[in-house]
Amino acid sequence: MHQTNQENRFRAWELLLDREEFRESTLRRLRTEEESPVLVLATCQRLEVYGHRLPDLEGVSIRHEWTEARAVERFARIAAGLESRILGELEVMGQVRQAYKDFHLVHGANWQELDRIFQQGVSLG
């Protein structure tokens, strides 16, 4: 029972790819994950994933992990452009909106809690 509660906690991960050639297959796998969907934010500067559980991935390591309120705060800060090299950078905000659209297109309203978190974050940008 305790493990299930752990898996249901909202999380954010900053990922590092062991090799750049893994990028496209990793992104495809993350974006189509059915069992525990995640929002994937891939920019030239970062690869971040938001959801409840990170699927098993080869050639990927976790650089940072945030849980619950800190994960929500992380997504909000990214969406608002506060973590960009240039404060409020519009390009990152557009990438966040596109990541949310991609998530919603694949997973729709089946994951209401995640959808609500992502909607609120996107509204900050």
Task: Give the ranges of each region predicted by the language model.
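Short glycine-/aliphatic-rich beta-strand segments at the starts of folded cytosolic domains
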Residues: 1-27
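Short cationic amphipathic helices and targeting signals
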Residues: 15, 45-51
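Short amphipathic beta-strand starts and helix->beta connectors
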Residues: 29-37
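Short beta-strand
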Residues: 37-43, 66
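Helix N-cap motif at beta-to-alpha junctions
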Residues: 51-58
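Glycine/serine-rich phosphate-binding loop and adjoining beta1-alpha1 elements at the start
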Residues: 64-125
